[in-house]
């Protein structure tokens, strides 16, 4: 296991974490590579233009599929929420709503990022009692 691994999993808000809606594949690929540290691993033209990016074995994809980016995004499970926050803030990304959520009895330290394309990302990490904030 790579001790530098940060991304553990990604889950879609709507239908498909490999087809999040964007209007410009090239712009999306460049931004997510620079800001989220993703690497382009696949580009498709059929059935719609799409690009698949990856970090730490976790894949997130973007497609020109007519979807509404403002109603979509992904929940990204990370191994170190504080490191994820520092990394993104260090690149000038505004972090929103740093808080503790509870889901099915599990506390999660979370924050949100709204990307320039309108997609929303919910970064989260399970925490134990006494580890809040």
Where are these regions (language model features)?
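Short amphipathic alpha-helices within nucleic acid-binding modules
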Residues: 31, 82-87
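Helix N-cap motif at beta-to-alpha junctions
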Residues: 24-25, 78-82
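Short, well-ordered beta-strand elements within core beta-sheets of diverse protein domains
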Residues: 20, 74-76
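Core segments of cupin and vicinal oxygen chelate
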Residues: 9-13, 19-59
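Eukaryotic phosphotyrosine signaling hubs
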Residues: 15-16, 71-73
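A short local loop/turn or secondary-structure capping micro-motif enriched for an aromatic residue
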Residues: 68-72, 129-132
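Vicinal oxygen chelate
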Residues: 1-11, 17-20, 41, 52, ...
């Amino acid at each position: 296991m790579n001790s530098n691994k940060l991304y553990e999993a990604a889950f879609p808000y709507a239908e498909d974490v490999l087809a999040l809606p964007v209007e410009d594949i090239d712009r999306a690929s460049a931004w997510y590579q620079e800001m989220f540290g993703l690497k382009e691993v696949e580009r498709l033209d059929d059935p719609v233009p799409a690009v698949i990016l990856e970090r730490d074995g976790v894949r997130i994809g973007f497609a020109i599929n007519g979807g509404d980016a403002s109603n979509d995004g992904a929940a990204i499970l990370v191994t170190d929420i504080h490191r994820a926050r520092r990394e993104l803030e260090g690149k000038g990304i505004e972090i929103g709503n740093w808080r503790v959520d509870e889901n099915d009895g599990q506390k999660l330290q979370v924050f949100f990022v709204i990307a320039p394309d309108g997609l929303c990302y919910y970064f989260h990490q399970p925490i134990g009692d006494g580890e809040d904030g």
